[in-house]
């Protein structure tokens, strides 16, 4: 889902892989994240689908990719599942956040009872605390969701009642009142490109996970010694 008139730039960036991609323009500019998801309704074709945000870089701690971890859980549980990551409260202004209960029979899976877009620390402490996590740590969105076709009428419902941009979390709130909705704590890490120093952090994470790790660490030590 892209902004109008930006399709050409994305095709150019995709290079030889552009013919594998389908671009859908979000005609209602500024209508919000929820409206962008709704624009993909026809493309989803009435099937469950994997949604990934475009400004996150994800690294798996296992040979299994992050998206595959999430899809396996959604396939087995046959319901909506959002990938989440333990996140300190200072970063709450950047992410949607869930609250709920850990499932004893399913490792890393949370039955979602509440979801709030970018909560305040006070709001998170009151409504989103999950047993087993230390104080000041919450489960925030990872940038990946497996959504069911039922998300579309939920989004239509909240958009029709709103006078401004609608985040995906409002659609998820409407959905969890009617159907099962889980969170899955991905065995990996996500980095947000869209925040201050986000690109730098992503580049460092990518470099430190590759063959030049020692070289990069040496350069970082040199920089620290210069800029003490």
Residue ranges of model-derived segments:
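Short beta-strand segments
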Residues: 51-54, 83-86, 185-186
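Residue-level signal for inorganic ion chemistry
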Residues: 23, 40, 55, 98, ...
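Short, conserved catalytic or adaptor-binding loops enriched in Gly and charged residues
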Residues: 9-21, 73, 104-106, 174-176
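Conserved core of the sugar-phosphate nucleotidyltransferase
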Residues: 59-145, 149, 153
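Conserved N-terminal catalytic core of the sugar/cofactor nucleotidyltransferase
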Residues: 1-51, 58-62
């Amino acid at each position: 889902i892209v902004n109008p008139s930006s399709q050409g730039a994305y095709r150019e960036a995709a290079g030889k892989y552009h013919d594998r991609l389908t671009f859908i323009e979000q005609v209602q500019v500024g209508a919000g994240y929820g409206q962008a998801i709704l624009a993909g309704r026809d493309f989803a074709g009435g099937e469950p689908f994997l949604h990934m945000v475009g400004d996150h870089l994800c690294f798996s701690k296992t040979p299994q990719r992050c998206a595959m971890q999430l899809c396996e859980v959604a396939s087995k549980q046959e319901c909506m599942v959002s990938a989440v990551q333990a996140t300190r409260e200072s970063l709450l202004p950047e992410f949607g956040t869930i609250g709920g209960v850990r499932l004893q029979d399913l490792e890393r899976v949370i039955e979602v009872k509440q979801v709030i877009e970018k909560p305040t620390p006070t709001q998170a402490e009151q409504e989103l605390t999950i047993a087993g996590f230390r104080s000041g740590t919450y489960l925030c969105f990872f940038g990946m969701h497996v959504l069911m076709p039922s998300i579309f009428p939920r989004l239509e419902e909240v958009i029709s009642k709103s006078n401004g941009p609608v985040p995906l979390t409002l659609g998820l709130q409407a959905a969890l009142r009617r159907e099962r909705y889980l969170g899955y704590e991905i065995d990996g890490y996500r980095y947000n490109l869209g925040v201050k120093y986000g690109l730098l952090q992503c580049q460092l994470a990518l470099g430190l996970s590759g063959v030049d790790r020692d070289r990069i660490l040496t350069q970082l030590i040199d920089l620290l010694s210069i800029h003490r």
